[in-house]
């Protein structure tokens, strides 16, 4: 019984069970880390280099909340591009994110969430296949964003399941954004 308890404590501490993101928002499984490294994600704003990013993941927010996303500051109207190949799963507008796009990677392992868009790309539709660098929209400040600080709110999430695919644990995307944003 002591051995079982010890194993359970070790597994729980390692993040093998659900219950929120791993410390620092890192993938819990080595296979996830390897998968994301191999994907060579592109910075999702045209013209922005990885070294230009300011890591806002896990920054403090009001009410003791944490920011589990990356904010990429850019001029309003700058193209927002797909960080990876995938399928546009949802295009929607809501009070928090404003104009948003969700892209699920082809293996359904990760969801890319793009928010505060000023406009959607012409002809963008749900179910559309996109490639790394395809335009999804433009940088804006819709939703709860400061109107004077246009930016892309970019979040990387583990694909949860077929019913709640958008509800997976967040992952800090910064270590995996290795390519300069380059609109196709």
What are these regions (language model features)?
Residues 102, 110, 128-184:
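Conserved, short, structured surface segments that act as functional micro-motifs
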Residues 16-99, 132, 141, 170-184:
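Surface-exposed, glycine-biased beta-strand/turn segments
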Residues 5-14:
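Bacterial N-terminal signal peptides
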Residues 56, 75, 106, 117, ...:
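Generic beta-structure capping elements
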Residues 1-3:
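Positively charged n-region of N-terminal signal peptides that target proteins for export
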């Amino acid at each position: 019984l002591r051995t079982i308890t010890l194993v359970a404590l070790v597994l729980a501490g390692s993040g093998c069970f659900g219950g929120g993101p791993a410390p620092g928002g890192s993938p819990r499984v080595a296979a996830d880390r390897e998968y994301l490294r191999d994907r060579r994600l592109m910075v999702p704003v045209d013209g922005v280099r990885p070294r230009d990013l300011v890591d806002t993941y896990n920054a403090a927010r009001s009410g003791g909340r944490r920011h589990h996303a990356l904010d990429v500051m850019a001029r309003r109207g700058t193209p927002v591009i797909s960080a990876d190949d995938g399928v546009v799963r949802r295009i929607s507008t809501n009070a928090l994110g404003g104009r948003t796009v969700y892209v699920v990677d082809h293996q359904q392992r990760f969801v890319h969430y793009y928010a505060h868009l000023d406009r959607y790309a012409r002809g963008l539709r749900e179910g559309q296949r996109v490639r790394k660098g395809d335009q999804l929209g433009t940088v804006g400040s819709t939703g709860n964003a400061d109107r004077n600080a246009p930016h892309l709110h970019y979040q990387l999430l583990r694909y949860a399941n077929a019913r709640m695919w958008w509800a997976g644990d967040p992952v800090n995307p910064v270590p995996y954004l290795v390519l300069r944003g380059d609109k196709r």
